[in-house]
Amino acid sequence: MSNSGKKLTQKLKKNLPVTGPQAPTLYELMQWYCLNTNTHGCRRIVVSKGRLRRWIWIVLTLIAVALIFWQCALLLMTYYSVSASITVTFQKLVYPAVTICNLNPYSYSKIKDRLATLEKTTNQTLKKIYGFTEPLIRSKRDLDVNDENSTEDIFLKQIPLFRLESIKGNQLVVSDLKTKKRTQISGKVIQRDAGSVQDSDNMVGFKLCDANNSSDCTIFTFGSGVNAIQEWYRLHYNNILAKISMEDKIAMGYKADELIVTCLFDGLSCDARNFTLFHHPLYGNCYTFNSAERGNLLVSSMGGAEYGLKVVLYIDEDEYNPYLSTAAGAKILVHDQDEYPFIEDLGTELETGTETSIGMQLTESTKLSDPYSDCTIDGSDISVENLYNKKYTLQICLNSCFQREMVRSCGCAHYDQPLPNGAKYCNYEEYPNWIYCYVKLYKQFVQEELGCQSTCRESCSFKEWTLTRSLAKWPSLNSEEWMLRVLSWELGEKLNKNLTKNDLGNLNIFYQDLNSRSISESPTYNIVTLLSNFGGQLGLWMSCSMVCGLEIVEVFFIDSFWVILRQKWHKLCNWWKNRKENEIEEIPDITVPAMAGHNNPLCVDHPICLGEDDPPTFHSALQLPQAQDCRVPRTPPPKYNTLRIQSAFHLETIDSDEDVERF
């Protein structure tokens, strides 16, 4: 009985193996765990076929376990450290670049010889318009304004000035200021001042016509003769400056030690050597404090009026051009070191005889590029060439685009903007039609017909300083006398007159505090958030992790691909087998038909074939029939059921499947 019981137990163990904690060996226990656990990855180690797949899943599972231990260790260390963090930071802001320009671009004593004829013509024109009898400029200009014969009328020929008297239909009745003849003119009217041409009498203007087509004209009208003369004067002024070399223009401008009298920064003394020359086409010699060309940038350690830049500027109002600069003072612009100072558009003006205090607040803005916005990072993806050699800005792109169109349409470059390679500045002698071309092109630019506004895009990052300005009378009555004496002594030989407070301006520019504001864009839904949300949904509803995702990839992409490939292979093999069988069945089964009588070729001249009743004799039986010239169909090859060609294909298919499973 004992032997039979042992045999029964062994048979049960063989047919029904014990699993789980009752497994007899550690290998069987691990195998059972991997087959029944909810931990992803372990089951794939057991069920995967092929050593390569098995080792891949072993490595992935071990890496996941190592990451879990590492992260848990960090969490435990952080939890049991029982520490509190206190952060105290002392911030220092880089002091921005400050560009300072005199509103008068050139000393009149240095440029008067080049502008003498233009100034005479302008002065005489004003006398004709308003009937002045006294000289309109001071005698120190050394101009004989009463000698009309000495004044050339070339400027009035190029751009004729007129007085608008009346309107008849679509034509204007004007009085030419040179010939005093009344004529009717027609063309496109551009009103540069507020109001309407129909509602204004005695308006002043000038006419620009195409040199190649005199009937194509543009008429500019102004409600005030001051604005008309200034606009007319500036057109001729730019034409004269376009023919002067850069070296001569720098020599005619103000030097740093002439413009800057005293300087303090952060409580320390500075001088003209801390300023960098920057020549502006409209304001002449300007000077930039804390420029990147000086090397290390200065920083502000504290906020407040005592820790900024303090300068006293010598304006020298007596050297002002009366028709170009009608306001006296200076203009400043706060900007980043790698930005071009568009001081004519963004600058802040300083008055003479006052102390101007400007508090700054820095704002840094950063926008997201494509696909969140249409901004550009550095302008490299813009088709417009940067003519300023500075950091890309929208204003740089627009000006460069207009200058490019100016060179393409008019053949020359405008004086107010940088010169492109291979181009020349416009002047009457070489390009007599440039002013009309410029006015027409600028109108198209303003109306966004040149495509510059659609081509140029905003920069994704930029810095902006918000300025708060306050004014005070400077110097005071009690301190005026001694301060002017001291400053006159410091100017020394540069000063050839008695100094007054209207010749000076005091500037104090500083950070209000060292708190900068940062405005940045961030995507509300990025790839990290997307993956986290996907992982949360899969873990909540399917208890699925990253390893589970890899299992899905293996089954639904890799294994499914091989299953479909095997199915296609089986179909191909079956098609090949059926094709071979069909080829065998198409061969016809040819047999010799039974023929009797004279239709049988073997019975020719035979007694039996002749139908004779008597049996053949021995002699007639020996007479064999002659061979007939006829082809007897050959017997087809036999069909052997033992030739099983499909079995060979079946064996190849089995081998191929085994090869696939080995992967």
Swiss-Prot record:
Record topology, Cytoplasmic segments: 1-55, 566-663
GO molecular function per UniProt: ligand-gated sodium channel activity
Cellular compartment(s): Apical cell membrane
S-S bonds: C101-C286, C209-C217, C263-C270, C375-C460, C397-C456, C401-C452, C410-C437, C412-C426
Gene3D superfamilies, per database record: Acid-sensing ion channels like domains (2.60.470.10), YojJ-like (1.10.287.770)
Bilayer topology annotation: Multi-pass membrane protein
Extracellular face residues: 77-544
Major localisation: membrane
Catalytic activity: Na(+)(in) = Na(+)(out)
Transmembrane residue ranges: 56-76, 545-565
GO BP: sodium ion transmembrane transport
UniProt keyword list: Cell membrane, Disulfide bond, Ion channel, Ion transport, Membrane, Sodium, Sodium channel, Sodium transport, Transmembrane, Transmembrane helix, Transport
GO cellular component, one term: apical plasma membrane
Alphabetized InterPro entries for the sequence: ENaC (IPR001873), ENaC_chordates (IPR004724), ENaC_CS (IPR020903)
Activity regulation, per record: Originally identified and characterized by its inhibition by the diuretic drug amiloride.
Function: This is one of the three pore-forming subunits of the heterotrimeric epithelial sodium channel (ENaC), a critical regulator of sodium balance and fluid homeostasis. ENaC operates in epithelial tissues, where it mediates the electrodiffusion of sodium ions from extracellular fluid through the apical membrane of cells, with water following osmotically.
Subunit comment: Component of the heterotrimeric epithelial sodium channel (ENaC) composed of an alpha/SCNN1A, a beta/SCNN1B and a gamma/SCNN1G subunit.
Family: Belongs to the amiloride-sensitive sodium channel (TC 1.A.6) family. SCNN1G subfamily.
Protein's recorded name: Epithelial sodium channel subunit gamma-2
Organism whose genome encodes this protein: Xenopus laevis
